[in-house]
């Protein structure tokens, strides 16, 4: 076999082998999957490296899920965007509704949606997981803080828990105990992200730490906005 080099060519060869292993033969769908893979590699480096631990036949489908989530998240969170919150909401609504409609009919011409629809069809992933995700993305455009953990959980379920639920059919676990475990893992990752990204979230005008939990430590949103790491913040 001819060696694949330089590096960019080698990556394309690896991607082609993964698509072959996954049984994805349609050229347009392969291009859509490759677009999703590049999104994963460029924007989710740790997630991308994690996919390399999976069998090659699984990787394109995971990239498709990432591509969908990343595209929606970029509409909402691109700090360089000149769009208003309402314009973002309109764009997300149109794109999300279009992808959901494509899932319903089993075909998409969207550059990201085509790989997603193929993945959903092959693995019979429930559409409500994607509806919940889009709902949480819309919340990011209107909700800037959460009074209680119960309030926050609605957002966390849609933005993180359902990602695990989307993954389970692809991973083909031995029993259904994987489903609640996937939810718990997604929630845990998201809560860790909230703790890590307080400053970044403030830049976007949001606080994900529940206000009732801040109050238990004598803190308010205003304390976080000072960007000072006090003993109370550490606690």
Q: What name fits each language-model region?
A:
Residues 4-235:
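Acidic catalytic motifs of isoprenoid enzymes
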